[in-house]
């Protein structure tokens, strides 16, 4: 077994912190497996060396579960003051100093949204007659805007539709990208409503070093993964901005209306644009806003302007739709309603979300069973203790343990999840056992997704992406054919 790299080779305090955590897990596993004494001694020596390097770099002792935030200042790992100053969320950046991740209660206050409480979850269950999705039960979708209006419409047999999207920046999607689509699929099933999915390949062309052809090819590849989530082809329209803008005058007209009613000062304040940003970036928010208005899709909704949409998305997309909600009544449309999700953490910890640009921070939908096992074992941040003895005595910290966080997303059984939480917190379950549980959940989940994706043909993609009339059964949707 290869030694961990020395502290001097780490390029940042966070990397050094993660190296200590990984080396600590190695020491625990060697002791638990009754490895030869010289091998254990060598691993312990490396662990002590890493901790000394950390202290030299940070000016303080390594503390399990408290990754470095400010490398030059003394800090209390989870103090409110630190969290308030370090939490940062916009459509491109998610950052916090807390190992527990973003303080979502504070984000609700900051963004001015409403918490999804037990009363709202119960109302969704009554309206649909279905058990709430685990993402609702566990607070993964935690915030909303005007969800009660959507339920009012549904209960009164009035129409609404779903809108979500994907910015295709690479061929392979990762686990975090699945979250809004898994939930949107459930919403489509229980409410039996049409869905539009925007592929913002124009956005990725503007922000990334891509050609137009690359951006569109990523749209097609990502669409296959989205289709593999099981969406109903008779109720789902997937569209590329680069393609659909030229096919739908109604869509472009809404873009222009939005552009006229939002000033540069407004978008600069909302999105942080600077004088050096290209004009395409400055105008793009109007493109993401336009699908919120039903007459952007005349093949589906004809010229109706009064049909509200519900947008399931990660909370970092909310700035786009705060702008949209401000504009909507001024151009004759209802405000879109929203359901916000938490972020899917990187393997290295909840300080940031999973990123497709860092292969070691992400589990991709193309990963093999072997790659999944290796990534979880090597890179998933642990809330465990430095030694087996300490872990048995004091237990692990589920609030910072990435493997447990991932199980809250993908393990359906509530009772089993609660038992895992109790066992890990009490010390009855070790980090290696928790990681094995996660691996056993993820490997079949991704293998099944890969099998469904393999069955998606180019013809299927074309059918999903062709503008057409969709099938739905609300009384108010009874158009003449």
UniProtKB/Swiss-Prot annotation:
<dbReference type="GO" id="GO:0001525">
    <property type="term" value="P:angiogenesis"/>
</dbReference>
<dbReference type="InterPro" id="IPR014729">
    <property type="entry name" value="Rossmann-like_a/b/a_fold"/>
</dbReference>
<dbReference type="GO" id="GO:0019904">
    <property type="term" value="F:protein domain specific binding"/>
</dbReference>
<dbReference type="GO" id="GO:0010628">
    <property type="term" value="P:positive regulation of gene expression"/>
</dbReference>
<keyword id="KW-0067">ATP-binding</keyword>
<dbReference type="InterPro" id="IPR009068">
    <property type="entry name" value="uS15_NS1_RNA-bd_sf"/>
</dbReference>
<dbReference type="GO" id="GO:0019901">
    <property type="term" value="F:protein kinase binding"/>
</dbReference>
<feature type="domain" description="WHEP-TRS">
    <location>
        <begin position="12"/>
        <end position="68"/>
    </location>
</feature>
<comment type="similarity">
    <text>Belongs to the class-I aminoacyl-tRNA synthetase family.</text>
</comment>
<dbReference type="GO" id="GO:0042803">
    <property type="term" value="F:protein homodimerization activity"/>
</dbReference>
<keyword id="KW-0963">Cytoplasm</keyword>
<dbReference type="InterPro" id="IPR000738">
    <property type="entry name" value="WHEP-TRS_dom"/>
</dbReference>
<keyword id="KW-0597">Phosphoprotein</keyword>
<keyword id="KW-0037">Angiogenesis</keyword>
<feature type="modified residue" description="Phosphoserine">
    <location>
        <position position="355"/>
    </location>
</feature>
<keyword id="KW-0547">Nucleotide-binding</keyword>
<dbReference type="GO" id="GO:0005634">
    <property type="term" value="C:nucleus"/>
</dbReference>
<comment type="function">
    <text>Catalyzes the attachment of tryptophan to tRNA(Trp) in a two-step reaction: tryptophan is first activated by ATP to form Trp-AMP and then transferred to the acceptor end of the tRNA(Trp). Could also possess an angiostatic activity.</text>
</comment>
<dbReference type="InterPro" id="IPR002305">
    <property type="entry name" value="aa-tRNA-synth_Ic"/>
</dbReference>
<feature type="modified residue" description="N6-succinyllysine">
    <location>
        <position position="158"/>
    </location>
</feature>
<dbReference type="GO" id="GO:0004830">
    <property type="term" value="F:tryptophan-tRNA ligase activity"/>
</dbReference>
<feature type="short sequence motif" description="'KMSKS' region">
    <location>
        <begin position="353"/>
        <end position="357"/>
    </location>
</feature>
<keyword id="KW-0436">Ligase</keyword>
<dbReference type="GO" id="GO:0032991">
    <property type="term" value="C:protein-containing complex"/>
</dbReference>
<dbReference type="GO" id="GO:0005524">
    <property type="term" value="F:ATP binding"/>
</dbReference>
<keyword id="KW-0648">Protein biosynthesis</keyword>
<dbReference type="Pfam" id="PF00579">
    <property type="entry name" value="tRNA-synt_1b"/>
</dbReference>
<dbReference type="InterPro" id="IPR002306">
    <property type="entry name" value="Trp-tRNA-ligase"/>
</dbReference>
<feature type="short sequence motif" description="'HIGH' region">
    <location>
        <begin position="168"/>
        <end position="177"/>
    </location>
</feature>
<comment type="subunit">
    <text>Homodimer. Interacts with oxidized form of GAPDH.</text>
</comment>
<dbReference type="Pfam" id="PF00458">
    <property type="entry name" value="WHEP-TRS"/>
</dbReference>
<keyword id="KW-0030">Aminoacyl-tRNA synthetase</keyword>
<dbReference type="InterPro" id="IPR001412">
    <property type="entry name" value="aa-tRNA-synth_I_CS"/>
</dbReference>
<protein>
    <recommendedName>
        <fullName>Tryptophan--tRNA ligase, cytoplasmic</fullName>
        <ecNumber>6.1.1.2</ecNumber>
    </recommendedName>
</protein>
<dbReference type="GO" id="GO:0031334">
    <property type="term" value="P:positive regulation of protein-containing complex assembly"/>
</dbReference>
<dbReference type="GO" id="GO:0019210">
    <property type="term" value="F:kinase inhibitor activity"/>
</dbReference>
<dbReference type="GO" id="GO:0005829">
    <property type="term" value="C:cytosol"/>
</dbReference>
<dbReference type="GO" id="GO:0045765">
    <property type="term" value="P:regulation of angiogenesis"/>
</dbReference>
<dbReference type="GO" id="GO:0006436">
    <property type="term" value="P:tryptophanyl-tRNA aminoacylation"/>
</dbReference>
